[in-house]
Each structure stands twice: as structure tokens, then as C-alpha cells.
Amino acid sequence: MSYTEEVYERVVAQNPGEPEFHQAVKEVLDSLKVVIDKNEEEYRKLAILERLVEPERIISFRVPWTDDKGNVQVNKGYRVQFNSAIGPYKGGLRFHPSVNQSILKFLGFEQIFKNSLTGLPIGGGKGGSNFDPKGKSDREVMAFCQSFMTELCKHIGADTDVPAGDIGVGGREIGYLYGQYKRIRNLSEGVLTGKGLTFGGSLIRTQATGYGVVYILDELMKAHNDSLEGKTVIVTGSGNVAIYAVEKATQLGAKVVAMCDSNGYIHDPNGINLDVVKDIKEVKRGRIKEYADRVEGSTYTEGVGIWNIKCDVYLPCATQNELGLDAVKTLKANGCKYIVEGANMPTTLDATEYAMENGILFLPGKASNAGGVATSALEMSQNSMRLSWSAEEVDEKLHNIMKDIYSKISEAAERYDMKDNFVVGANIAAFEKVVDAMKAQGIV
């Protein structure tokens, strides 16, 4: 049995009932086989893989809070501090009913590599709760956030662990969390990112992940003598990542014809009117189906199936495992040439393999959606220097980081004779940096 297989079997045996975490570890270990086989003796001796797949720390806690009817509710809170070899733990907080330890370990594990690719000194972590902010009043969300931070504040800090937002955690939640941290610790420091602009936030942070997806797509297309000009694009989701991916793709000359939310999808052959989407999702917090009522010539379809619409570029920006094998086969049959992940692991393993084997150029989320965490790290830099950069400065730094990520992952893939295999390239480039740092710091 190979070293990677041994480590994977051990992960499955020691972490039963955690399929998302198993999937993330398997994908990474499989793609790193060429590097691991080359350095197997040294890695075994130092137990590099065994240490890499085991979080440094998992914090689990109860979160009691009182709802508007005066009833006490109890949720579970978590923080997975996965790897700090290259810097303080960095990764989002997710508030969603589906949150459990497996999902957070998968996200935290992926975060190690994504953060490594940014070239910035940040380690990997993730946290959250099974609390659902949907349908809750502002007071209930505040009560929950304050209770959650009352425990979490013992384990985080500007040089220790710097959480950010994720699904269910936007500007409102970050504000409540930060206020409670400051109140308890009496410290005004960059302990959270995604903050409001009036209290230490960074310009472009909201747009960063979506913009970054399109910047790296643009680099990929340029490298293949192509451009976004005149291309038909589908973007799944309708949250921050999706909205700003649509905005940047449109600015670069593409026509985005479809978006969706968890209920269904809209198709607008004339190109999505982003002002209407922003009004529905950001102002009214409504459902995407309202778009079809407001924009002539557009249609709304209940349920899944957005991939049946013809496109040149498909950007999955909604949630994990949203894009399966049959969907990718349909995309290929309809002439799709590029799939660039905006969400975390939105494409299943078999769908990813099919795309790459059948000539679709595929960029994995750990590379393509790293713009968000990169800009979070830029927010940390601004906080520690007590500075605030202009939108143009932050956008330029983001653009350069995404260019740099593309060149790193394509170079790593070519070095191992796997040109255009960006899944392998991303994992190798990220892994090598983390391992070098782990080796230098001894057995810790």
C-alpha cells in the first residue's frame, strides 16, 4: 500500500461519518502522489502527511441565546484551527443548518492550500454554527452572534486566528461579532475581516472573491489565446461571489445569461441586468424568481437544471457538490470550454475528472476563489498598519495576486508534465510551500 493510501485509510478510520472531509483529503492526496512518491522517505520520517491531515486544534462549544418569544435556544459552535505553519489561522465562519464538524474540517483543510497560494502569510482554519440566520430578526441574530463570540473570543486574535464571513455571515453578523469581541477583550484590533468601512474594513472586500474568479479566468483565457469578449457565461448562485463575478465578467465584455438561488434559476438571453439582481438580493433579500417578473424576455425555472442552457464559460458560485457528472456532460455537449469554481468544492470528483479528460479547462476553487481570503489578508495588513488603501490600490493588488496564482499553478503542473491540469498544479504549488514551512519549524 502506498504512503498516500495508508494516510487516507487512517483518516477514514479515525474520522468516521465525515464524508466531506474524506472527499477533500482524497482529492488532495491523489493529486499530490507525484510529489509524495518523489519525497516519500523524508515525508514518512517526518510524518508530514499524518500531521497535515490532522487539525492542530478543534474547538467545539454550545451557544445559548434567547429568541424574540423569550425562549432559550441552543446551537453548536465550532472553530477548526487546522494549520498555522505559514501564519495565523485564517478562514470564514459559516452559519447554516448543514454545518457540522466534517464540513468545517473539509473547508479548513482546503483553506490551508488556498491561503498558501495567495503568497501571503496566513494559515488555514474554518468555523461556524448550525444556527440559521434566515427568518430571524436582527435582534435574534445579534443575540446569537454575541453569545457565539463570548466563547470564540478566548481562542482568536490578530496574530493567532482571524475569522471572516462565509455562508450566512455577512456584514451585519461580522459587525455584531466584532462589537462583542471588542466589548469583552477591550481590544480594537484586526481580529475579524469583512468589517464595515467605518471600523477597519477594506474597500473591494465584498467584491473580491467574485472579481478574483474572473481575473484568474481572464489569465487562463489569455494563456490559451482567448478572451471573455463576446462569450456567453452562466454564473450559479446569487450571493456576493456570484453577483460580483457577473459584474466583472460583464465589464470584461462577456454576456452573463443565467443565475440561480436554492429555489430555481433565471435565464435572460439579453444578458443579466445586475442592478435588478442586486436590488432583489442585497436590498430586499428576496428570491431570484422576482427577476422574471421585473425583466421582460427573461424566464424563471423552478428547481435545478441551469446547466442545460448553452454557454462558453460556467462559473459555479453557489455551494459544495452542486455540479455533478451528468451536468458536466451536458455542458460539454453544449460547447462549454471553461469551468472556473467560485464556491468551495462545488464540482464532484467524477465531474471534475470528466471535465479535464474531455477538454474543458477547469480551475479549482482553492485557486480561483482565493481572491476573498487574499483581500481579507490585505485588510489585516491595513489594520496592523492603521491605514486604509483606496479601492484602486486594493483592486490592483487583488488582480496581481490572481495573476500570480495562475502562473504558480500552471508552472507547477508543467513541472510535473501535467500541462493544464490545474487541480494538480494548485495542490502541488500550495503543498510545497506549507511543507517547507512545516519542515523548518520541527515536529510541532
Predicted regions and their residues:
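Glycine-rich phosphate/diphosphate-binding loop of Rossmann-like nucleotide-binding domains
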Residues: T193-G196, G201-N308
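Glycine/serine-rich phosphate-binding loop and adjoining beta1-alpha1 elements at the start
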Residues: H96, N115-E229
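Flexible, glycine/charged-enriched surface loops at secondary-structure junctions
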Residues: P19-H22, K38-K45, G119, I156-G165, ...
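Phosphate-interaction motifs
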Residues: I59, P64-I122, K126, N130
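Structured beta-strand/loop patches that form or line metal/cofactor-binding pockets in enzymes
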Residues: E41-N71
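Adenosine-phosphate binding glycine-rich loop
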Residues: S2-A24, L220-M221, K332-V444
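Rossmann-like adenosine-cofactor binding region
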Residues: G264-F362, A367
